[in-house]
């Protein structure tokens, strides 16, 4: 799989998780077979850019390429500036967070709360893509509320804006992490757009990884919670996908 000019070593990606996927954890996951990893989200609020937390999250020293920095916020201009800052800081890919379901993030109209305003989504996508000369990716969910899934429109608009790849968690914000991931909609998105689609949600075993890839036709899978305390899951999945056998 390619993200812009960058060919990943495989199609297994570490999902961005605030407070979890710091640089040491990303490095560990890559050591155990992940082909790519996305950073923890970093706020687009420039007044917080020099905080201890922000500086720690923006430390990519020694990280294996390609380096992907995720940004979060709701103002298109602020997000564009944050993207430029991360590129100057060493990021080779910028990821926009429209998937975080956390209350404190959504209360600021960031993360998955953005899915309530498709016009704002479009402005953010256009502005950030135009702001940097590196690939811009999007991480998102099916929609904000159950019964109001708007991911097909958002995915098409992302492709039109020049987004290089779309990572999709198969739940709405209302679902949080309850119910089951809806791979049927991920499959529809994959059939709708031509850019790479990354399937996310409930992938916790080699068998599940193969099923999701086969069923959705996704270009890659993204694993988050299942990698906590078990970063070698990437090696297990890669071996199973390549041989049909367990390590």
Indicate where each model-derived feature is located.
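Flavin-dependent oxidoreductase catalytic cores
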Residues: 1-247
